[in-house]
Swiss-Prot record:
Keyword field: Cytoplasm
GO cellular component, one term: cytoplasm
Name the record gives this protein: SVF1-like protein YDR222W
UniProt keyword annotation of Isomerase present: no
Listed InterPro entries: Ceramide-binding_SVF1, Svf1-like_C, Svf1-like_N
Length: 415
């Protein structure tokens, strides 16, 4: 019997999970109870490993074709720690980014650092900067060392606390840029139980249609996520921030048992090929964490919406859910506003699965991703590739199950 065209797909998403079932009762996700599954996904990738050397040798036409094919390959992996200080209202993230583009011709690491307040009158610490990292001394599955940054997972379980291990982040960047100087980070994080959706946290993309009945397909082109929805962070962050007067003022942030989220994300294709839009939530309170991430594939890959979320209570996962093409369990914009410059309709009130809503989103950053490009290049990107990427970031006091906390929300529009 011939297969119909409706049995063919170009996108194979993660498995759906019924959030009402008890945690650990589903075969559609894998719980993470030690640090090993948190290792760099790209480290062992023979195509993109940092220590992989690109050969200039070619073997005639086939070698040239291989180089041309590799030139289209791209992969980005980020390991991000979001922190939410419930006492001071200061929030932010420390992110280590690894990228390989043009089949590995360019490879490198970057540190992204952002701090913002949850209240409109708390902007003194606001900063968002990126730093290219040179002099890489070590890149192992669970450890990265450069001249200025150490990012390392430690197998220090604490059964009494319930932690699966620790993450240590140390940074010393004396000369940064014109906005901040002397960035120093010294954090130690206790990580609690995490999870990844099956298969292996991956959503796969295909250039040609494949049969839906093939359960074991995979592709180098993918979106992959590994989640640790709850952790506790202790340590210090300090930097000198440039004031309007031109002088620099020292800022010091002391974190004591501050709730955090850790997220590992891999994107094995260009951003505009992976998704047309994204939504993200990180809510933290004294007892609860609510985490959600959602993306919609472009038209070339069937406009599929994938949503994943979890709820943690007292450092333990109590609910995990995922939805593919089920509108009732996707993110909903309850109220919106139109950006006159970009044309995007962005949320001012939002509802996430898992029972979380925020009716009064407070925009802390509106970022034009192409804004730093020359106007001609930006115009070409918008016209030829049909992309206009904008990120809308929000942070505000919120409630979940009548408990006060702080939520970080992001809505990203690409094409």
């Amino acid at each position: 019997m011939l297969e119909s065209s409706s049995d063919k797909i170009k996108f194979a998403p993660i498995k759906e999970v019924d959030y009402k079932k008890p945690v650990s009762k589903s075969k559609n996700y894998t719980l993470i109870n030690d640090i090993q599954p948190l290792e760099w996904y790209c480290h062992n990738d023979s195509e993109t490993g940092y220590q992989h050397t690109i050969s200039n040798k070619t073997d005639g036409g086939r070698g040239l074709f291989r180089v041309m094919k590799k030139s289209m390959e791209t992969r980005v992996e980020t390991q991000t720690l979001y922190f939410t200080d419930l006492h001071t209202g200061l929030c932010g993230f420390v992110q280590l980014l690894y990228s390989t583009v043009m089949g590995g011709i360019y490879k490198g690491f970057q540190l992204n650092f952002k701090v913002f307040g949850s209240e409109s009158n708390n902007t003194d610490y606001d900063v968002w900067e990126s730093f290219k990292l040179d002099d890489i001394a070590e890149f192992q599955p669970l450890k990265f060392v450069s001249r200025n940054v150490i990012f390392e997972f430690l197998s220090n379980k604490n059964e009494k606390l319930g932690s699966i291990g620790q993450l240590s982040i140390k940074c010393d960047l004396p000369t940064c840029n014109n906005t901040i100087q002397n960035l120093k980070i010294d954090l130690l994080v206790d990580l609690f139980q995490g999870f990844k959706m099956n298969p292996n946290g991956c959503n796969y993309y295909f250039d040609k249609q494949i049969s839906m009945s093939d359960e074991f397909v995979s592709s180098d082109k993918m979106i992959r996520h590994v989640f640790v929805p709850r952790g506790k962070c202790n340590g210090n962050i300090s930097y000198d921030k440039k004031l309007n007067s031109g002088d620099f003022q020292n800022k010091n942030i002391s974190l004591t048992d501050v709730p955090v989220v850790y997220l590992d994300a891999v994107q094995g294709l260009l951003p505009n090929k992976a998704a047309s839009k994204w939504n993200f939530l990180c809510f933290q309170s004294e007892n609860y964490s609510v985490l959600a991430i959602e993306f919609t594939t472009p038209r070339d890959h069937d406009n599929v919406t994938v949503t994943v979320w979890s709820i943690t209570e007292k450092n333990k996962l109590i609910s995990i859910g995922s939805s593919v093409q089920s509108p009732k369990r996707h993110v909903r914009f309850r109220a919106t506003s139109t950006d006159k410059e970009s044309g995007w309709v962005y949320p001012t009130s939002i509802k996430f699965p898992g029972g979380f809503s925020e009716h009064d989103l407070r925009l802390v950053n509106r970022y034009d991703v192409l804004g730093e490009l020359p106007s001609m290049v930006r115009s070409l990107a918008q016209k030829i590739v049909s992309i206009k990427p904008f990120i809308y970031q929000y942070c505000q006091p919120s409630k979940y199950k009548h408990e006060k906390g702080i939520s970080i929300v992001e809505s990203t529009f690409i094409s």
